Amino acid sequence: MKATHLTSHWQLFLDDSLIERATGFDQRIRQPRKHGILFPDRQPWEHGIGMFQPVYDDGRFHAIYRVNWLDPEIEAFHASQGWKGDPADLGAATEWAYATSSDGIHWERPALLLCETPVFRDGKISGRTRENNCGVPFDFIRDLGRDGNVTDPARRFLLRTRTGQGTPAGRSHHAQARNPGGLYFAAEFPDFVHDPDWQRKLMPINGRMSPRGFGNFTGWDDLNGEWIAFMQGTAPRWFPARDIARHWSKDFKTWESRGVLYPDALDPHTLEHYDEFMEIQVIRKGDLWLGFMAVFHSDRTSPDYMPPFIEKENFRFAYDLPNYCTRKGTTDLRLVTSRDGGHTWNRVANRQAWLPHGANDDDFDRCAYTGTPITVGETDHFYYMAKNGDHLESLHDRTPYYKDRTTGWNAALASYPRDRYVSISTGTYPAILYTRPMLLPPGGLRLNADASHGEIRVEIAAAPAGGIDDIHSAPVEEGFSFHDCTPVQGNGVEQPVRWRRRPDTAALQGHPVRLRFYVRNADLYGFRIEAS
């Protein structure tokens, strides 16, 4: 068996690519702790909140997000352009707002004084004010250095500027989609409030985002040498269910795409509960890509749940499949991983929900949508979009689904110890995990584990390239036995493993070995070699 060259990245047990044998272990998904919504006190211009995009730079959290409100000026502008559709949608003014935080939990929305937003009285616009946090001059930002596998510090951030600010076209989602701004790399979060030369410090990109959209750009795929993005496939790929597509480009100019993640025979597919893949956010995590996928548990029992832009006589599409494009249902988040640049995917932990949606119809996250984590110290802050009701807002005849209340989206926060997504665990009866052959870099072994009620020991054995390779009887490398190993008995995301006579793995260079983990009443999340 060919040995895997390990890097100093964390090796997480999100898949079994490094596991040879794990008899006697349980695989346990670890659901994060929910903290609720970030902005319970909505401002008048925050009729809707969406696309919350947080980053962490120079010791501080920054976020931009989309807000909207109903505005007769925008409705008149859309009418002048001949656009048709849902009246509520055509009357929606869109702006981009800014929030900041020192701890990632408590957020401030400073008055930027950059643009006007409405003042409401008795539900109607009675004036305008600049005392708001709106007017952000870009509508997308992505930390490619943290999440996107980009090592050049000058290209750490990717952002897209806006067009037509201060005009109706600049506040029209429809107009912005047809006339997007320019793409840029940046070395730091742009100080667009205090620095008049902020845009001159950007590195322009002569190109465009993927044809599907810009909200879920992923990063650089070094394996295939291309920029990649993953998101819901375009209609009519919604037939027979929503799915996930991979988009790629060598130069940001020419984009190609194909579907890569589809619901399969193991996913529920009854009219009452038909699973679809609504959306995904993907980040680089060590040597793999980790996806946070929103699974839509759709209800197809009535044609009234179909969108108004599809005529009822076309509901069955080309085949006898009723109500295939429903909007009624809930969403939760599942984990998926890829080691080939997103061409193939692994469904993590038997497809269990990692971030479940709220159990009650009026819970703040009855629909839990995609997001990304930001790691600070030993904690991952996971920011996601949440809706306090069903995904369905209006029926096919455009009447509201909820007759007694108004639902909406908000930004929400969950947290968990760093990288603790899935554990390999045992109870009081111990077990031994055997890895596949690997070539280790020189350095100290570190564990992300909770062994506070038990113990973990590590042994390193030879993995000969030829002849009989028996994972049980292979000789132990001198000084690296279970007996030589000091038990790990704490709870921490980076605990050192020590052998009495071997401070690190420097003596093991050049030949393949296997790690053996003895685990008793403990949870093991991952390991890495810290370079010496």
How should these model regions be labeled?
Residues M1-S532:
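Carbohydrate-active catalytic/glycan-binding domains of CAZyme proteins
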